[in-house]
Regions:
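A composition-biased, non-transmembrane "mature-region" signal
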Residues: 1-203
Length: 203
């Protein structure tokens, strides 16, 4: 059973596969069926990613909190023949927490817009830091081939030195390459600058 849906962008989302709603076995990136999302690490359920603890926690909360809210008063009524105010209040609190759990895990519109840009060049609307290393490396190599064909530098310093000269249609590619290249400070700053320029041209 796949539950704990978070970070949804245009039908793409992160979720967790559970056994009997109790044991999390894998976190997955799930996308609408498309040849572009057929990547290393994919199976019939989705693309295997690193453990996303928000998805795991919300998966538990969305299943067990409403169940506990319903079962608690039923058990007390069956065992003791009536309900105490404390039990009723506890059920209300559990239901309120369940509602919050279903509303949690949404991305702000700014982040959705950023992930859409990545999706235009990779097919994946997910931050590369959440992917398995093998999946990330394959996507990075693919983007690198396109960068090389376009004669665009492939180091953070090189990219920034020609940033203003890169044609706007190529900016999603350059931004995607910088995001997939690594999580160290130089690449993060390079990616941020690339995205800033893309936004300026997109206005």
């Amino acid at each position: 059973m796949i539950i704990g849906r978070v970070d949804e962008v245009d039908g793409h989302f992160v979720a967790t596969k559970f056994v009997a709603f109790a044991v999390p076995t894998a976190c997955l990136y799930i996308a609408p069926k498309s040849p572009r999302t057929t990547v290393a690490g994919a199976n019939t359920d989705g693309v295997l990613i690193q453990t996303e603890w928000r998805s795991v926690a919300l998966g538990y909360a969305r299943v067990w909190l409403p169940l506990a809210a319903l079962v608690l008063p039923l058990v007390e009524a069956a065992v003791f023949g009536g309900l105490h105010l404390v039990t009723v209040l506890a059920s209300v609190v559990l239901l309120a927490l369940a509602v919050l759990a279903f509303r949690a895990g949404r991305l702000p519109e700014e982040e959705k817009a950023r992930l859409r840009v990545l999706g235009t060049v990779t097919g994946l609307r997910i931050d590369p830091s959440k992917l398995m290393d093998a999946t990330r490396m394959i996507k990075h190599a693919s983007l690198g081939d396109l960068m090389e064909k376009g004669g665009i530098p492939m180091s953070p310093e090189g990219i920034l030195s020609v940033l203003d000269d890169i044609p706007m249609p190529a900016m999603p590619l350059v931004y995607g390459f910088a995001c997939y290249a690594g999580d160290d400070r130089e690449w993060r700053e390079c990616a941020a600058r690339c995205y800033e320029r893309y936004q300026q041209g997109d206005i």
